[in-house]
Structures are given as structure tokens and as C-alpha cells.
Amino acid sequence: MAQLKVQQKKGVVGIKANQRETLRTLGLKRIGDVVVKEDRPEIRGMVNTVRHLVTVEEVE
């Protein structure tokens, strides 16, 4: 199954609370943090919520 590499590229100051919680749920705490998650619809939805704060790459 494919995986997604998600990296936080912007900080959380001044963003909405639900976006802040979504970053925490993904496991991102600070700028530059990287996590690898399974490519599932739930994860895609979370990434879509914070798409302006993260970069996403598909990895094998």
C-alpha cells in the first residue's frame, strides 16, 4: 500500500483551532516535522484540511 510523507511547512500561530488539532492528530508539532502515514481516505481528508500548511509526497 502507498504511503504519504507529510511535512509541516508553516507554523500554527493565527490558524483556526480545528486546523491546529488536525496537525496534532497527524503527529506534526513544529515547522519541519515529517511523518509517514498510510494513504487512506481519512488521512487524505486531514491533509486536505491543512493543505496550506503542509507539503505531501507519495512514497512506496
UniProtKB/Swiss-Prot annotation:
One of the GO BP terms on file: translation
Protein keywords: Ribonucleoprotein, Ribosomal protein
Any one cellular-component term (Gene Ontology): cytosolic large ribosomal subunit
UniProt-listed Pfam families: Ribosomal_L30
GO molecular function, one term: structural constituent of ribosome
InterPro entries: Ribo_uL30_ferredoxin-like_sf, Ribosomal_uL30_bac-type, Ribosomal_uL30_ferredoxin-like
Superkingdom, taxonomy of origin: Bacteria
Matches recorded under HAMAP family: Ribosomal_uL30_B
Subunit structure: Part of the 50S ribosomal subunit.
UniProt similarity note: Belongs to the universal ribosomal protein uL30 family.
Name listed for the protein in its UniProt record: Large ribosomal subunit protein uL30
Annotated gene: rpmD
